[in-house]
Design a protein with these regions (language model features):
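Acidic, mature catalytic/reactive cores of soluble proteins
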Residues: 1-266
Length: 266
């Protein structure tokens, strides 16, 4: 059996036993109970495989579940379940999934619904995850101080010092959650200060979203198209200003102390 044949034979469609996800879906793992829910950015890679194997309806159902969650919570949550948005979001790849489906099987009415959802997601990133320098950062949806302290005390994925103040615990958990939202939990890339960095990849994804919306509305709504085009150009200028080094390499930007990271991450 070839690898391709194995993949084709092992796609498995789930129905959410809790009833939260309204559409059947294909999760990132088959048998691990924790990862049989639909995770946000994992779904992009799953969908590329589904589309390649002609399973367009399964890929569309995955996206429909993400859109459902976005409309319910105001962001695409880390994973699709009733408490999925309490933690954070994940890298904004929904527009790439929509683009892939538009190419694989155009559906003008569905595309209108999907693009309306993308505009809503864009508002989330531009209001809840904007930094003072004008670029975007990762963050957390957890606002309750007691919850952050409790989560610090119970954290097991990496070793954390216990004899620290509650303020340190709160700031550490904010950054660890932001790191999780980046999809790279955990990484030395952000020096345990992920919420203080405007990431190259995050801002590149948002540039891609702005470019997609500019193009989509090009022959439908000139005003919207111009708005997203101007936002795209502004982002490109800010990324060049804050992220580009003398050799033309882009680095994550720590806006809290006006420093480019010394880590080559993108």
């Amino acid at each position: 059996m070839t690898v391709r044949e194995y993949i084709k034979n092992t796609w498995k469609v789930f129905t959410d036993p809790s009833g939260f996800a309204p559409y059947p879906y294909v999760p990132p793992c088959l048998d691990d109970g924790r990862f049989t829910v639909l995770y946000y950015w994992d779904t992009f890679f799953t969908n590329e495989g589904l589309i390649a194997d002609g399973r367009i309806n399964d890929a569309r159902n995955n996206v429909n579940n993400l859109i459902f969650s976005l409309n319910k919570f105001g962001c695409v949550p880390n994973c699709v379940w009733e408490r999925g948005a309490e933690y954070a979001s994940q890298p904004p790849l929904l527009y790439m999934m929509v683009k892939s489906l538009m190419k694989a099987e155009p559906d003008a009415e569905w595309e209108k619904t999907a693009v309306a959802a993308l505009e809503k997601e864009y508002v989330f990133w531009m209001t809840e995850r904007i930094s003072p320098c004008g670029l975007n950062r990762h963050g957390t949806n957890m606002k309750d101080r007691r919850t952050l302290i409790r989560d610090y005390d119970n954290y097991t994925r990496i070793k954390l010092p216990k004899n620290v103040s509650d303020d340190v615990k709160v700031q550490t958990m904010i950054s660890l959650t932001a790191e999780g939202e980046s999809g790279e939990d955990h990484t030395p890339r952000y020096h345990r200060r992920a919420a203080e960095y405007a990431g190259v990849d995050l801002n590149s994804h948002l540039y891609g979203l702005e470019s997609f919306l500019e193009e989509y509305f090009g022959d439908k709504d000139k005003e919207k198209s111009q708005k997203y085009g101007e936002a795209k150009n502004k982002r490109a200028a800010l990324m060049k200003k804050f992220m580009e080094d003398p050799d033309g390499v882009y680095h994550d930007y720590r806006y809290t102390d006006d420093q480019r990271s010394d880590v080559y991450a993108c």
